[in-house]
Regions:
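Short S/T/G/P-rich N-terminal loop/turn motif that feeds into the first structured element of a domain
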Residues: 1-70, 90-103
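Conserved short beta-strand edge segments in small beta-sheet-based binding/regulatory domains
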Residues: 77-89
C-alpha cells in the first residue's frame, strides 16, 4: 500500500457542498477508497493561503485516479501528490490549521 501527501487548491464556492457530502457519510462508503478519502478530507489542513494538504492511502496508478474521478476534481484544482511513509504526512501537517475549523 502507498501513502501520499496531497496538496490542492479548494474551489471555494464548492467547499460548503463538499462539507455537507462528508457529513452525509456518502463519501465514506464509496468503494474501494471511501474510508481513506473521507478521513483525509475531514482532517485536511491549510498548508498556505488557499492550499489544502492531507495524507491519503491509495493503491491506484496514477495515484488518486479513482478519487479524482469521483470527488477531488470537482472540488479541487492543482492537485499534487508526494509519496510518504504511513503517518509521515500527518505528523508533518498536524500543527497546521484544519480547513474545516478546529473543534
Amino acid at each position: 500500500m502507498a501513502y501520499y501527501l496531497v496538496t490542492a487548491k479548494p474551489i471555494e464556492s464548492k467547499m460548503e457542498a463538499l462539507r455537507q457530502w462528508l457529513d452525509s457519510g456518502e463519501i465514506r462508503v464509496m468503494k474501494p477508497f471511501g474510508q481513506a478519502l473521507h478521513m483525509g478530507l475531514d482532517n485536511a489542513r491549510w498548508q498556505a493561503e488557499g492550499v489544502a494538504i492531507w495524507e491519503e492511502e491509495d493503491y491506484c496508478v496514477p495515484p488518486l485516479a479513482q478519487e479524482r474521478a469521483a470527488v477531488l476534481d470537482e472540488y479541487f484544482t492543482e492537485l499534487e501528490v508526494k509519496h510518504v511513509s504511513k503517518g509521515e504526512g500527518w505528523k508533518h501537517i498536524e500543527p497546521l490549521k484544519k480547513i474545516w475549523g478546529d473543534p
